[in-house]
Amino acid sequence: KPLAITNCLNFGNPENEEIMGEFAETIQGMKEACEYLDFPVVSGNVSFYNGTNKKNIFPTPVIGGIGLIENVKCSTNNNFKKIGNRIILIGKTFGHLYQSAFFSECCEIYDGPPPEVNLKNEKNNGETILKLIEKDLLSSVHDVSSGGLIMSLAEMSINSSIGVHIIKPKKLKNIFEYFFGEDQGRYIVEIDDDKFDLVEKILKESNVFYEIIGKTQKDFFEIYGETKFKVNELYNINTKWYKEYNAATN
């Protein structure tokens, strides 16, 4: 259960009107979100004049949250638990790619607006996820954030050594938008078959959009039956860079 947030707001030269405008809009956005979500700001820090060679950094507000687990027996994490469980995506996917990791890292596109935030859906989806966790109905949960759906699924597989089989959505969107878009207020949940009906009932009663996107399986990270990787290969790729980085810097 979220209790409060803190922040560190990192910006360039505030003597530049554009930079000061970014800072002011950031504060306004935080204010609106915190008031709606009932998250008090208990502390914070501001850092200006950040840049290199007279070039300002991108506006970088960093938010840290603190929460309370009232019953640790009902807590969960983002590791898949069992082969054959259903995987459900909570929240609507619109395929927003601007300001995404995919656009910046793979396409070198850095402009464009961030994804729209619907505070009503954000609050409702988050509170419903919390309710399902408290009722011990979810095997695992992961928010969809940096990197989009595909990265969150990969993290869950790598952490647990359990694969996935992802099916085609009923309304197939652009594959890059679907898997790499960073639309807000979304969660991946893993559910035992015998708990699915009750989970579905609560989601419908709470007016939460959801779609079944696949199942957990042994060994392979599989998309539509067309693209397939061994989970241990993904693990090796995920850990290899750090070993090579250490070797190069030591």
Q: What residue spans do the PLM features occupy?
A:
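Glycine-/charge-enriched secondary-structure boundary and capping motifs
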Residues: I19-A33, L37, V42, V46-P59, ...
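Short, contiguous, pocket-lining structural segments
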Residues: N121-N124, S145
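Mobile "lid/hinge" segments at catalytic clefts and subdomain interfaces of large enzymes
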Residues: K1-G12, I19, E35-L37, I57-N121, ...
